[in-house]
């Protein structure tokens, strides 16, 4: 391999395309109308409408009804899998421990354990609810919910 110098670096063959020069005469293939066709709104400078504009017809986003809402308390709750509890190296688990381990976000106030994955070690859940299946799995592993 030859010495590579900063002043000898060049892009690979075919990697760069020549800039499209429009409105520079008939011979260029992009003269006169410069690829814009003849007349009409789109041929003129500043001649573009906003996205969703339908020529004065009521646009689709206004014809369709509004639906649903965003619950404000959505980010307060988090679901935790049994496999997440298995990975934690503490026996007593509460929301603070889940936050510290990065299992749930910092804005979470309430957590619920769902039956997803395996749990083979004893854990004590404090201030955390669980589904019926998850509760059975925790108790089968020798743990409890406080």
UniProtKB/Swiss-Prot annotation:
SUPFAM superfamilies: Ribosomal proteins L15p and L18e (SSF52080). GO terms for biological process: translation. Residues 1-65 are annotated as: Disordered. The keyword Iron-sulfur does not apply. Keywords: Ribonucleoprotein, Ribosomal protein, RNA-binding, rRNA-binding. One of its GO terms (molecular function) is structural constituent of ribosome. Residues 24-34 have a biased composition (Gly residues). GO terms for cellular component: cytosolic large ribosomal subunit. Belongs to the universal ribosomal protein uL15 family. This is Large ribosomal subunit protein uL15. It comes from Bordetella avium (strain 197N).
């Amino acid at each position: 391999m030859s010495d590579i110098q900063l002043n000898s670096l060049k892009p690979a063959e075919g990697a760069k395309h020549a800039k499209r020069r429009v409105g520079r005469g008939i011979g260029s293939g992009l003269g006169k109308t410069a690829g814009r066709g003849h007349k009409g709104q789109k041929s003129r400078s500043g001649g573009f409408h906003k996205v969703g504009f339908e020529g004065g017809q009521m646009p689709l986003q206004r014809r369709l009804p509004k639906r649903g809402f965003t619950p404000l308390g959505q980010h307060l709750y988090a679901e935790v899998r049994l496999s997440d509890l298995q990975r934690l190296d503490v026996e007593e688990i509460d929301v603070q421990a889940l936050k510290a381990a990065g299992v749930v976000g910092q804005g979470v106030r309430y957590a619920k354990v769902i039956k997803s994955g395996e749990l083979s070690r004893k854990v004590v859940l404090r201030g955390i609810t669980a589904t019926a299946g998850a509760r059975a799995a925790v108790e089968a592993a020798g743990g409890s919910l406080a």
